[in-house]
Amino acid sequence: MSKKVAVVTGSNKGIGFAIVKGLLRRYDGVVYLTSRSEERGRTAVSQLKELGLNPEYHQLDVTDRESVLRFREHIKRSHGGIDILINNAAIANSAQLYNSHEENEEIININYKSILTIQELLFPLVRNNGRILNISSDCGHLSNVRNKYWIERLSRQDMTVNDINEFVEWFLKESRNGTFKKEELADDATAAAYRVAKVALSALTMLQQNELAARNISVNSMHPGLVRTDMTQGVGFYSADQAAETPIYLVLDAPQNLKGAYVWFDRKVLDWYDYNADYYFKSKTLNG
């Protein structure tokens, strides 16, 4: 019988690196550290080997279809499938709370559109009874959206990926045209593209769960808390190792029937649809 396989995208540093480290200490199987930059990935692998841990490594740029295809072929050839897939590769809004259109496009591509590619190319490799975890954010709760039309469309029981994609494209069009209004999103639309991407990802998670339910694969999204990483410029309440605890719980210990959920860093399952809730990201928390 082939060994079980866990894959963590964007895992050469921060939460992803901490998740790989935690899995290597607990998971009875192969754990893949992946990164866009092979050099940085190999450095991260060396750091883990110094701790007596032994990850596998493969280059993976989630925004590059050819890179994802190469990774897919490697996994098929070497292992035949994946048992745990953690979609962690992400980029925030750099140091600014407001961004140029080009930055907005990059943020959307990495945090949302790349997941569509992963879904198309890697989800078929996830074995029956496997687990998929999308690392979202408090920016990913529906309460980040203030536009009533989009709240309604994203709350529909018959929501499709087309609804989510149109939400994302609406934002990009408004951004490109300079017509986006700050009242469309919470907190004066700070980190707007990141909010839009993570809301889209959290919504997509529920559709992914529906598609994979017949194979008893659990798909969840989660907010890891404000973590001290490069992405938050070192601001945060938790270390990366602490933040990795709930993601590791969700893929190793949570009941298999926890499916399609939006989970907070304290393992509490939240009502994602409660758009009046106080779960949205507040930029003042970045002031430490």
Labelled PLM ranges:
Residues 27-43:
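Conserved glycine-rich Rossmann-like NAD(P)H-binding loop of the short-chain dehydrogenase/reductase
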Residues 88-95:
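Conserved NAD(P)H cofactor-binding loop of Rossmann-fold oxidoreductase domains
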